[in-house]
């Protein structure tokens, strides 16, 4: 008989197994039965942790976004000056979106992870936009820039970062350079 596991450990195992199967087979073609078979557990155990396959999709999205938030938060250390925080934030955001896109790729181009990618990307864009808005408002208050509408500007910048980071051929340094130029031009 198998040893019982801690609830969080077991829940994480379900999330990891579902994530693996989604990447291999797509979300539509991955069933609850295939997830429990992957873990060699009873189907009822799945339903102890999740109401449905959609709950697992949401849990994976939450995991990705928790990682995304932690990555960009590291650059917002209040002991750093404004320019260091802005540059660090932009660099971490670009890398974090690339990582998120990498996580949202199936084993081949026919694998459809649209449900998961839409949820994850929208939440990540919202988080990054809110943080960038705060930074731009601070830059305006410090007279380091003059961005007329920080909220709209942030949404535009973050959407561009998210889109460009999703293309494997995109050079992350080039994305950062373009963003710096846009902020520099808009902030005059």
Features from the language model and the residues they span:
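Membrane-interface starts of transmembrane alpha-helices
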Residues: 146, 150-154
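Hydrophobic alpha-helical connector segments
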Residues: 59, 70-99, 153-157
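N-terminal intrinsically disordered/low-complexity leader segments
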Residues: 1-9
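Hydrophobic/aromatic residues within well-ordered alpha-helical segments
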Residues: 10, 53, 60, 64-68, ...
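C-terminal peripheral helix-coil segments that are non-catalytic and often amphipathic
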Residues: 1, 88, 95, 130-144, ...
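Short secondary-structure transition hinges
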Residues: 92-133, 141, 162
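Short coil/turn segments at alpha/beta junctions that flank glycine-rich nucleotide-binding fingerprints
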Residues: 24-28, 79, 100, 142
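Helix-turn-helix
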Residues: 13, 21-55, 59
């Amino acid at each position: 008989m198998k040893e019982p596991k801690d609830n969080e450990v077991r829940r994480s195992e379900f999330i990891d197994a579902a994530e693996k199967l989604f990447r291999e087979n797509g979300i539509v073609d991955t069933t609850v039965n295939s997830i429990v078979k992957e873990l060699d557990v009873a189907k009822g155990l799945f339903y102890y942790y999740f109401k449905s396959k959609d709950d697992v999709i949401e849990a994976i999205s939450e995991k990705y976004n928790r990682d995304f938030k932690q990555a960009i938060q590291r650059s917002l250390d209040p002991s750093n000056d404004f320019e260091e925080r802005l540059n660090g934030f932009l660099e971490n955001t670009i890398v974090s979106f690339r990582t998120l896109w990498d996580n949202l790729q199936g084993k081949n181009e026919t694998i459809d992870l649209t449900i998961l990618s839409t949820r994850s990307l929208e939440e990540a864009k919202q988080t990054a936009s809110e943080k960038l808005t705060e930074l731009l408002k601070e830059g305006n208050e410090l007279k380091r820039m003059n961005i007329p509408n920080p909220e709209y500007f942030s949404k535009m910048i973050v959407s561009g970062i998210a889109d460009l980071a999703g293309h494997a051929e995109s050079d992350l340094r080039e994305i950062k350079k373009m963003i710096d130029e846009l902020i520099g031009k808009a902030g005059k």
